[in-house]
Amino acid sequence: MFWFIVILRYNKNSSRKTKIVIYSGEMNMDKDPFKEYLRESEPNKATKGYVWSTAVGLQAVDGLKPSQYLIDTAIQNIEGKITLKEAQSLIESYYNERPVRVSDNERTEEADKVSSRIAELLSETAFSFSPNEYIAIHRKLFRGIYKHAGKIRDYNITKKEWVLDGATVVYGSASELRATLEYDFSQEKDFSYKGLSIEESIHHLALF
């Protein structure tokens, strides 16, 4: 099944919605370890199930697969046996104590740590739609994993994307990234979603 994840903040005092993140990819829902919790009648469990399912799904977009330890720890959190902070602490300790690291190709440690951090971000209510928040989210997700976490690149890049059948994407000039971010965010803040269908909203977000 091909899926989009669109997470929006709604401003109760206006018709605007503020985008946090949009991703697309493929996921076999029959293999989703949190599937049973998505049907839970208990709101808290259902919400946690969606949070963890989304976090793991976003890793799958980059071809990353979390460990069974992460899945088991997440389920403990969903069932209320441990808090999210305790779940994160267990994940951090798990890798601090491991004598053998997985290969770079598997990148399981990255998948586990980033999944738990995404789950935390999706559970928070505080949010500011700004370039600084955008950069802060990157820092929070990838701290200790990548040296450039939370930093705007200072060099130009190109990248082949599997979602585009290997086509090469040329990214914006490094010298203009900050100005480009400021402009794009200001344009989005002024955009009104009033009267748009879900499909039209997703189309606009994808272009943004």
Give residue ranges: language-model regions.
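FIC/Doc superfamily catalytic core
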Residues: 2-208
